[in-house]
Every structure is written in structure tokens, then in C-alpha cells.
């Protein structure tokens, strides 16, 4: 079976989904499928992978086609449109990632027109929070006239959690659904490097108790809660330092820094910017506690990575992974409402109880290694693809 994955960007600066696709493609290639990925040359706002534009690059068992983007918004790519029109019929299945993007919508439309079944993974873009808080009017119009027809003719919908499925179906998704949790490279996270790389790069963290937030800097991540939560926590734990690891839109990040200044936190927050590779792993090794106070997450890859690293984790009900973890086992995560007081109380409890931290970290690491692996994700998608291939094709 030959499968094409389509996503607007593979830049890790965009967070979990963009970082996940290479793992997914590799797992499917290892499972015996022929896999290609088509994307733009986007490397975050104002940047592009200049050396990769308009070419096919061989990766570990699969190929990636990079096409030049013409716009930041919507990631319009006319070279992609020309290519997908001529090549979509080369594939048995098209797996579309994310919606409200030119590449994803074009791929679905051309696949439908040529009778190639397509599967959609919305990756949270149909969640209620995003529909209401991100370009609400534009999204409502686009959804009605562009995305809704695409959803209607999808062979199936893939959701990362039951919570994501509920919200997408409330938004109007009606295609057959499959819930497949995302997988991560637990082998790397089980054997972390030492904290020295991080501590040498950010020496102000030495001798401190590290509270780690490691994710994209975005309004949905609850950073407006995290800052006052840390201000409250610091009163009882003066050695605590908050590490905010991630990148985001300049205006939004500047607003966060101003908020931190007004709270008197300037000397106790380390703004690292985007961390990847050994820097990211070393940050996980240096951390005492991981926190993700998001309002909305269709899964929560950053949380899963912290669990796999053996960190005690504090999160909120808006992170869909939390619901799935709690349904599988108790005493793995601390999950409290997305409000300052309960978050501050829970964070203080974690920092003050070493035994609790050790227990939660060990349980989290065990669950991640046993139930959220790349191989299990690949096997589940291979099975789903086979089921779609055996289903009657819809007529354009």
C-alpha cells in the first residue's frame, strides 16, 4: 500500500503535530508501507527551509516533498497544488493532517475528485476552544463552505482521544471515526542525557528547583494562568525557577514577558526559546516538575514526553491525554481545573512532597513505555488503512 501524508509544515517550531509526522511516517515504513510526506518549506513565521524547497528528500524509509509557500497565513503553495493534482492518483490513500490550510484542503479536494480515499486527522483544530478563540468569523465561514464538504466525503476521521472525537463531532464531523493515541520515541526519553547541557547553557538554573513548561507559546496553553501560579508558588518555594521553553508569535511572547515583569518574576523565569535535540532532553533531565496548564489540547504530546521522561506532571482537564490516562490508571498525573488557585495548590503539593513526585514520575514513565509507543501507533494506523482500502469507494 502506498500512502501520502499531507501537512502544512514540518517545522518543530509549530509544536507536537509537526514533530510527530516524521515518527508516524517512519513507523509506517517500518511496518511495510510505502510512505511519502508532502508539505511546504515553512520553518516558522518568516522562515523557510531554503535548502529543501521544491525537492524530494529521502528520510528513514520514506520521502518528503517540500514545496515553496507563498503566504504565511493559510500556507498557500501553488507548486504544491500543481504537484498534488498530477500525483494524488499515484497513492492508494491520502492521510490529511490539520484543516484550515491550503495544502490539506487541496489534497482532500483532489483526492476526492480522482476517487482516492482520504483520511483526516484534525489534530485539535475542530476543538471548541480553537473554533471560538482563533479567527472566529473567518473559521466559521471557511468551515461552512470549505471544510464541511471535505469532512463529509472523508473515508474516515482519526482522533487522538475520545475528547477530541466528541468536540469534532459536535462541530459537524460525521465520517466513521477511529481513536488512535499518538506514539512517541520512548527509547530516547527513557535514557536521558544529564542535566549539564541545559545547566551550562542556562547557569542561572543551577542550584534551583526547576518547574518546566515545554511547549509552543500560545494562548491556549494557559500561560496567562502559569505566571500568577508561579508567583504564588514562589512565596513558599523561593528556590523555584520557572523554565518556559518554547517559541511563539513575537507580540504574544512580549506580552507574556511584560506580565511576568508586572508580577515581579523577571529574575526567576528562564525564557529559553525553542529547545530541540539534546537541549530539550537535558531540560527534561534537569526538571523537578513538569506543568502544562492548557485550556485545550487534542492530545498533549509535550505531556506524554514528560511522562516518558519520568517527570511528575501537573496538567488540566483541557489536555485530552489527561482524561485517557486517568481512564487507564490512577496515580499517574495530577489533574486540576484550569484556574490559578487549584493549580498553585497542586504545584505547591508536588514541590513539597518528594515521595509523591517519585511515585507519579515512575508510574508515568511505566505507562508511556507500555502504551504510547511509536510501534503501537504504526500498527494501529496500518490496520486502519487496510480497513479503508477494503471499504467501498465513494463517488466524487
Q: How should these model regions be labeled?
A:
Residues 327-328, 332-340, 349-354:
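Conserved acidic donor-binding segment of nucleotide-sugar-dependent glycosyltransferases
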Residues 41-44, 184, 214, 241-257, ...:
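Glycosyltransferase donor-sugar binding loop
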Residues 312-316:
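Short hydrophobic beta-strand element within catalytic cores of glycosyltransferases
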Residues 251-254, 266-276, 283:
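Active-site donor-binding acidic/aromatic loop of nucleotide-activated sugar
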Residues 4, 158, 204-221, 227-230, ...:
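Conserved donor-binding/catalytic core segment of Leloir-type glycosyltransferases
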Residues 39, 143-195, 204-206:
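Donor nucleotide-sugar binding/catalytic pocket of nucleotide-sugar-dependent glycosyltransferases
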Residues 1-52, 56-63, 89:
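N-terminal subdomain of nucleotide-sugar transferases
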Residues 295:
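Aromatic "clamp/platform" in nucleotide-sugar-dependent glycosyltransferases that forms part
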